[in-house]
Amino acid sequence: MWANLQFCFRSICKIKSRKLRIFVFMANLLLKPTFGNVHGSHEAYDHKSSKLFIELGQRHLASYVVNSKTNQILAYEFFQLNDKLTPSLLNGYIIDKNFSLNAFEGVFFVHNQKEFALVPADFHKNHLDKSILETIHGDLISLQTQSDELPQWEIVNIFGIEKSIYDSILAILPDAKHIHINSIYLKSAFKQLVNMHDQWIKVYFYPSYFNVVVMKDAQLQIMQSFYYETADDVIYFLINLTDQFLLDVTALHMQVSGLIEEEFITFKELKKYFLNVSPEVNPELNFVKGQEPHQPLHYFTPLFLSSQCV
């Protein structure tokens, strides 16, 4: 009997070890580390007084942990995806980091995806969410619908999560909350309205795409994602937006953040076409002393907004 138990235990260990090796191999193929301050599991903090944020982007996967009281950034890492995010890759990442084994004060998934729609709060009906998303984005991918109420703007942001991704999250982190990145942008923008100019554009850069928020006279004009390959693509899309909403390129203020270098061609081209362009550095960034990043601080602005807006 004991021999059988030993055999079973060794067999289970071998299976788990094999699965771990497979995940590490797949992760090395699909996840390209971009920046971060952790290696292996996030262990060096009190989980019960911390919040975990996992951002699922169109071309990236990121996570970070903040102290619930001070909002100090305790751990973070950002990966570019070489292919589409799959449930198995996401689950493997969560398990590898021991996120599912620790009792965080709160766990939040930030969905940085294009499947969303802004609906006036007075006209929002829950039973129509799925139809609205399918009308705008199609029905080729099965989506789990979610919504964020934004009373400051009197709108509701309805968004879709790929059903297989949502189900995998539900199975491993059932108490996690879900929020869309555009809801984060709008909550952040509302806090800044008093100090904003009449016309402004915020541009958040991610791997292979950027998100845009356009404001005019304290009113939201558009929120949209654009895929790009060259600096010319970025200029083309932004000039079109200024024409569409009758913005004055000599008067509007543009703030850029995320994965864009000031010395690279994209930023330099923006400065040619728009007079008032500047990197946006989040003044509330609070890193652990001695763990300040080597990257420019505007890299982190869009990633850490979520902890300040939930």
Write out the residue ranges for each language-model feature.
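Hydrophobic/aromatic-enriched cytosolic interaction surfaces used to assemble or bind macromolecules
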Residues: 2-310
